[in-house]
Every structure is written in C-alpha cells, then in structure tokens.
C-alpha cells in the first residue's frame, strides 16, 4: 500500500508540478497525508455506528427501486432470496479518509478543496452503488453470494477509485492552469 501511494504521489508530482518537488517536500507530503488520513479515519470510525446506519439506509432505498420486496431492519437488508449485512468495513470510511486526506494535502485554496469535497461525495455514492449492485447480484444468485460480494465489491472499488483520484487531479490541474493564465 505504501509503495503504491509513493508511486501515485510521484506520478502526481511529475504530472502536476513538472517534477519540481524536492525529496524533503515529497516526504513532507507523505507525512501530512498519513497523519490526516489517520485522524480522519479515526473520526469516521468513532461515528461508525451512525455511518453504518446512513449507508445501510441509503443502500436500502436504492435497492428497493430495483428489488421492490427488499426490507430493512437495523443494518440488514432482507432480500427475497438472501440477506445483506452492512458492517463498518462496508461504509467506505477507509476510502473516504484516504481521498479526503489527499484533497486536504493537495488543495492549495478553498476552491480546490470544494472541488475535492465533490469527489468525496461521489466516492460515498459509488460505495452505495457498490452495495446496491451486491444486493442485486446476491439476490439473483444466492448460491454465489460470497463470490459476487468479492467480484462486485472489489471490482467497483478498484475501478472507480483510480478514476475518482485521477479525475480530481486532472480537474485541479486544469483549474490551476486556467488560474495561472488569468494572472499573466
């Protein structure tokens, strides 16, 4: 995980700063990222029960659109052919903490931060989509529920997280480029 972040950080640095960061600045970026990530993650973990409730409810609402017989009780979504339990790991708090840490460390002003918050909300709803997709698949194929949880769950996360991160970085790059042009 750390080496992946280092590679991504250097990709970010090379792509968006033309390789102008010193080794000290790179290390400082990573230290800030990890500290902010841990703080945000622990805050989200502290509110884990509430977050589970919110994620379960929103997942249920969207699942109900495609599976009208779905029922909700606590953090369980009861489907006609299966039951899905939403636990703390399903909330996306790890993903949200990482994305928020990147945004806090990388943003240079409030506009960039607000753009980043949009991507955090998008990540939150991508996670809801992931749970709804799992509900749909495990209801259609109850005998393979674990397989669909793994494939759909990780497939969505591993596909859309890089898209969100790269999308955020590209938008910030365009914003910074247009801001620099207007100052010339």
From Swiss-Prot:
Keywords: Cell membrane, Hydrolase, Membrane, Protease, Transmembrane, Transmembrane helix. Pfam families: Exosortase_EpsH. Its main location: membrane. One of its GO terms (cellular component) is plasma membrane. It is found in: Cell membrane. Its EC number is 3.4.22.-. The active site is at residues 90, 130. The keyword Cytoplasm does not apply. The keyword Protease applies. GO terms for molecular function: peptidase activity. It is a multi-pass membrane protein. The chain crosses the membrane at residues 27-47, 86-106, 114-134, 151-171. Transpeptidase that recognizes and modifies its substrate by proteolytic cleavage of a sorting signal. Following cleavage, a covalent intermediate is formed via a thioester bond between the archaeosortase and its substrate, which is then transferred and covalently attached to the cell membrane. Belongs to the exosortase/archaeosortase family. Archaeosortase E subfamily. This is Probable archaeosortase E. It comes from Methanocaldococcus jannaschii (strain ATCC 43067 / DSM 2661 / JAL-1 / JCM 10045 / NBRC 100440) (Methanococcus jannaschii).
């Amino acid at each position: 995980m750390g080496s992946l972040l280092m590679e991504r950080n250097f990709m970010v640095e090379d792509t968006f700063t033309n390789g102008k960061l010193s080794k000290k600045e790179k290390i400082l970026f990573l230290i800030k990222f990890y500290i902010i990530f841990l703080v945000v993650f622990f805050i989200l973990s502290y509110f884990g029960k509430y977050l589970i409730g919110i994620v379960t409810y929103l997942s249920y609402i969207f699942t109900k659109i495609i599976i009208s017989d779905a029922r909700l009780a606590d953090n369980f979504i009861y489907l006609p052919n299966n039951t899905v339990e939403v636990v703390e790991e399903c909330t996306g708090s790890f993903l949200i903490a990482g994305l928020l840490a990147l945004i806090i460390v990388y943003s240079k002003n409030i506009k960039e931060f607000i753009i980043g918050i949009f991507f955090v909300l998008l990540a939150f709803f991508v996670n809801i989509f992931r749970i709804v997709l799992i509900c749909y698949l495990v209801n259609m194929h109850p005998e393979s529920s674990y397989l669909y949880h793994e494939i759909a769950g990780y497939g969505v996360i591993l596909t859309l997280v890089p898209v969100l991160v790269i999308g955020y970085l590209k938008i910030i790059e365009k914003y910074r480029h247009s801001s620099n042009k207007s100052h010339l």
